[in-house]
């Protein structure tokens, strides 16, 4: 099979992970040199013939997989990124972490081999779970699923009550909100936009040429709705289903706008994303869409990659900067050659995800640095029924136009949702997961609630003989990219937390919810990793006894009829559970061995750091101290480095507002006098 077939056919693909991760393993000898815009233009032109060859091959592969379903007309399936291209500005970057790391696979392999020597052959017979499944179990689960579908309205009533409570807390009335938004509102169904083409959107030739070469001819609904409004310079609040092509929906109008801006050495557009991986994908898509535009430069400001190299790149004042919120603020404050004074367009991608990750303060700080009167703002969010989202919209946008494409709370039409009733058998979940993974053929993403659980599952499955990768916040940037590369190339199972729920754009056949998410919205984000662009996909969810899990199942059945109970051979599960219990000692040994190796590595890092501090002491001390906006706020609110609790902080703020702030510090004598006065006044009252 051709390597290109592994990628999903949407414009949001992350085709360049191979090149990034390969380069991150090598130490860069020099910092990124300052490139002129002319040189960048030549580099883009050198890629034309290469992209053309891959575009033709990908077009033929996409046509071979065409389906007659209506959904195929709604999504563009003629486009596919090529794995042969390079990321000019990222491939030689260093990662912030050292290349040295613990080889967990080797530790697991040794433990597995030692277990085999001690216990003999542990190979199990796969069996046929569909034939051996308990019929009574299946009937019970089917009846419960039917009942859940019938009682779906009851779940909605509960949600309506919660919504009423939220509405009571809000200060703004419906009339105020209506006045805040522009009168024009776009709420479009996919079928209404089938006939639209990019030519009808009146885009410039360089953009049309790049779209044509990439095989991208028919815009998705969100692109057809958003691009014309964005080209008018209006602010936009867009809500669309995950994987609907929103990356191109905001990149195309930005590039179109920059075509008519006179050459200037300043950054004109900033794109904010919640994760580094998504920022890398957006950078890749933008570079491909702008390959025929003269002197168009892209920059990145994300955590995990070398800070110095990013500073060198930002010195060139790239036209478009893709960033994560924290690193962008760091560069604005501490990189002297980088400025946001001339920014004309601000994109907030996956705003709901940013707020979930706790970036509210960072977003507020960025918005204060780029006043909304000077910029056009496009905000994209998968969900809008959130008070924090509404607050962010009012803070960041000026008379925005709403664009709502898909009906809320829906999942892809070709997704089959399967549910496994766990009941009170939580301890059997690893065994059930192993049984499923042995049966499934194709790439599978397993979602867990915590990174500790994800890591432990990797060890358990590894000791049982499965090769799996993990992706979560406890990993370094180098480890993340290496694991994504492995998942794309030779590993079929990726265990991850919600970090990757909206960051991966690799073709995935199965999504397993090992732990059910907290909300139905997060559930839709997770299962949205499969059944994309009109393809078929399957989600399998382990459902517990909590009301939270039950409500998610009710909503899933109500909004998608393709929901079934999956049959499980519980006798086979019990056998696998016995093996897992026998491996409990080995699991603890692997965790302990990994912990010791990590401590040794950390000690070596501290030693190297101390040596560097001594060796380069003068150079380090001569550098200006890096600042952070939160530190300055706390420094302003505290005295002599002492922490101020919320009660004292509020009292200090009230004194300032009333003009009663003390101009001196109370002495011991002052406090004694106050106590004496208080006692005398209390005696008089008596």
Swiss-Prot record:
CDD domains: DEADc_DDX27 (cd17947), SF2_C_DEAD (cd18787). Residues 47-56, 639-650, 674-686 have a biased composition (Basic residues). Residues 414-581 form the Helicase C-terminal domain. Its EC number is 3.6.4.13. A motif (DEAD box) lies at residues 349-352. Residues 181-192 have a biased composition (Polar residues). Gene3D superfamilies: P-loop containing nucleotide triphosphate hydrolases (3.40.50.300). Residues 17-77, 94-192, 638-686 are annotated as: Disordered. It is found in: Nucleus, Nucleolus. It catalyses: ATP + H2O = ADP + phosphate + H(+). Residues 17-30, 60-71, 120-142, 155-179 have a biased composition (Acidic residues). Associates with pre-ribosomal particles. Belongs to the DEAD box helicase family. DDX27/DRS1 subfamily. ATP-binding RNA helicase involved in ribosome assembly. This is ATP-dependent RNA helicase DRS1.
